[in-house]
Amino acid sequence: MKLSNKEFDKIVQRAIRRIPDEIRQHLDNILITVQQWPDPDLLEEMGYPPDEPLLGVYWGVPLNERSATEPPLYPDTIYIFKGPLEEMCASLAELEEEIEITVVHEIAHFIGISEERLVELGYE
C-alpha cells in the first residue's frame, strides 16, 4: 500500500484520536513526526535486527529518568516510519490500527511503561 504524505498524515491523526485519553494526554509535550524510513545508523545504534521492520521510535529522556535540575536538551519526539508501515499493512483500517499501537508503545517508553504492561493493556 502506498499513500501520499497528506493521506498518511490524516491516518496518523485519526489513529492518535483513537488512543485512550489517559494515554493520549502525554502527547501534549511530545512532537510526532513522520519519516519515510528509519536511518540505518539509528538501527545499528539501537541494535535493531535489520530483518525486522521498525515502525516507530521514541527519542528523548523518559519521565522516570529526568533530572529536576537538568532539563532535556532536545524536545521529546516520536518518529513514525511510513515505509515499513505501508509495506506491513494491507488495508487502511490495519494501517490506522498499527499506527495507534506504535504511538501507544512510544508514549509508553516516554512515561516508563514496560512492554509487559503494554501487553497486559492489550497493545501487543
Model-derived features: positions:
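Short alpha-helical catalytic segment bearing the HExxH-like zincin motif
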Residues: 98-106
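Short hydrophobic/aromatic patches at helix-to-coil boundaries
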Residues: 120-124
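Active-site rim/adjacent substrate-binding subdomains
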Residues: 1-98, 110, 116-119
